[in-house]
């Protein structure tokens, strides 16, 4: 039960929040509503930034997925481009979380440099523009439902590289 409560609280915290100043209007001010909305990652994808990316080490220009949304049994083509503002060295890591509804399937810390070999890159990564492409064969048997993925990435000094999330990626059962 505690597990489900924690997962629900996390989802509530990650969801876009909409609060109006009028709901806190003690002094009858005419302030306009405060809107805290997630910022989408440019391109054909379901990705959003977890928070304001302006101070991140990675400036993502665009991420394209094909097909979007991903389909079971199909090859997912990923093309991404961006600019690294600093060198990324060994010791960088990713905090990865994958959920199926409210159920956490994966919660792990992964070595970023070990993961980069999957997209034919390796550490150290120098500052500057970069583009990566990757083909991923998705299994035919993905349980139908809504999935949420979040990847929070840090350099070896704990500085924020980027944080991305994909909410409610839905796989439908065969009809």
From Swiss-Prot:
It is found in: Cytoplasm; Cytoplasmic vesicle; Golgi apparatus. SMART domains: ML (SM00737). GO terms for cellular component: cytoplasmic vesicle; fungal-type vacuole lumen; Golgi apparatus. Optimum pH is 4-7. Residues 22-37 form a propeptide. Optimum temperature is 25-30 degrees Celsius. Gene3D superfamilies: 2.60.40.770. Residues 1-21 form the signal peptide. GO terms for molecular function: phosphatidylcholine binding; phosphatidylinositol binding; phosphatidylserine binding; sterol binding. It comes from the Eukaryota. GO terms for biological process: intracellular sterol transport. Keywords: Cytoplasm, Cytoplasmic vesicle, Golgi apparatus, Lipid transport, Signal, Transport. InterPro entries: Ig_E-set, ML_dom, ML_PG-PI_TP, NPC2-like. Monomer. Catalyzes the intermembrane transfer of phosphatidylglycerol and phosphatidylinositol. Belongs to the NPC2 family. This is Phosphatidylglycerol/phosphatidylinositol transfer protein. The gene is pltp.
């Amino acid at each position: 039960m505690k597990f489900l409560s924690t997962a629900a609280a996390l989802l509530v915290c990650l969801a876009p929040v909409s609060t109006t100043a009028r709901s806190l209007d003690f002094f009858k001010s005419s302030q306009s509503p405060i809107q805290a909305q997630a910022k989408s990652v440019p391109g054909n994808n379901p990705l959003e930034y977890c928070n304001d990316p302006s101070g991140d080490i990675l400036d993502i220009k665009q991420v394209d997925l094909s097909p979007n949304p991903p389909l079971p049994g199909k090859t997912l083509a990923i093309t991404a481009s961006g600019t690294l503002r600093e060198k990324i060295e060994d010791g960088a890591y990713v905090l990865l979380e994958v959920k199926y509804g409210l159920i956490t399937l994966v919660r792990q810390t992964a070595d970023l440099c070990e993961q980069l070999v999957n997209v034919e890159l390796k550490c150290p990564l120098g500052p500057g523009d970069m583009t990566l492409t990757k083909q991923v064969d998705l299994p035919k048997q993905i349980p139908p439902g809504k999935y949420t993925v979040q990847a929070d990435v840090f350099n070896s000094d704990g500085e924020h590289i980027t944080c991305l999330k994909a909410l409610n990626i839905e796989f439908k059962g065969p009809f």
